[in-house]
UniProtKB/Swiss-Prot annotation:
This is Large ribosomal subunit protein uL5. Component of the ribosome, a large ribonucleoprotein complex responsible for the synthesis of proteins in the cell. The small ribosomal subunit (SSU) binds messenger RNAs (mRNAs) and translates the encoded message by selecting cognate aminoacyl-transfer RNA (tRNA) molecules. The large subunit (LSU) contains the ribosomal catalytic site termed the peptidyl transferase center (PTC), which catalyzes the formation of peptide bonds, thereby polymerizing the amino acids delivered by tRNAs into a polypeptide chain. It holds the Pfam family Ribosomal_L5. Keywords: Cytoplasm, Nucleus, Ribonucleoprotein, Ribosomal protein, RNA-binding, rRNA-binding. The lineage of its organism: Eukaryota, Metazoa, Ecdysozoa, Arthropoda, Hexapoda. Its main location: nucleus.
Length: 184
């Protein structure tokens, strides 16, 4: 009796290595000056994420804005995992799940901003005030760690890399999002 081997045709869309996930969510509040306003912005990020935010320094002096080199002017925080998905969901709800095509980068990431942090469900505190913040979402696939690990690092193949269209399709499927085409 001869062994019969069958060739199984696999659908590339069902390959688990092609699934997209959120690698990290970066939240940023740029105040443009150091001092009390910056520490209050840090409190906002700490309330939102439950993590200790990091201060960003100015790269160079801009006299017209009154910014000196190495002066702390912004605060940011990186969130991963389920907490990142939950915060992103709240941010997209503020934007009514609408993003422009220009919000997506060629490497498959996307970002957007909101005007007021209190729209995210944080109670308004008069001593803190109202701050706007930027969301930046970095997407990835299984196997992307090859590029970032210290030992035996490699590169992600061209077919496995994310494109702008992949990110837009993922956003539309996962969040039932609307992508607006803006014309100049």
């Amino acid at each position: 009796m001869a062994a019969v081997t069958k060739k199984i045709k696999r659908d590339p869309a069902k390959n688990p290595m092609r699934d997209l996930h959120i690698r990290k969510l970066c939240l940023n509040i740029c105040v443009g000056e150091s001092g009390d306003r910056l520490t209050r912005a840090a409190k906002v990020l700490e309330q939102l994420t439950g993590q200790q935010p990091v201060f960003s320094k100015a790269r160079y002096t801009v006299r017209s804005f009154g910014i000196r080199r190495n002066e702390k002017i912004a605060v940011h925080c990186t969130v991963r995992g389920a907490k990142a998905e939950e915060i992103l969901e709240r941010g997209l709800k503020v934007r009514e799940y609408e993003l422009r095509r220009e919000n997506f980068s060629s490497t498959g990431n996307f970002g957007f901003g909101i005007q007021e942090h209190i729209d995210l469900g944080i109670k308004y505190d008069p001593s803190i005030g109202i701050y706007g913040l930027d969301f930046y979402v970095v997407l990835g696939r299984p196997g992307y760690n090859v590029n970032h690990r210290k030992r035996k690092s490699g590169t992600v193949g061209f077919q496995h890399r994310l494109t702008k269209e992949d990110a837009m399709k993922w956003f539309q499927q996962k969040y039932d999002g609307i992508i607006l085409n803006t014309k100049k």
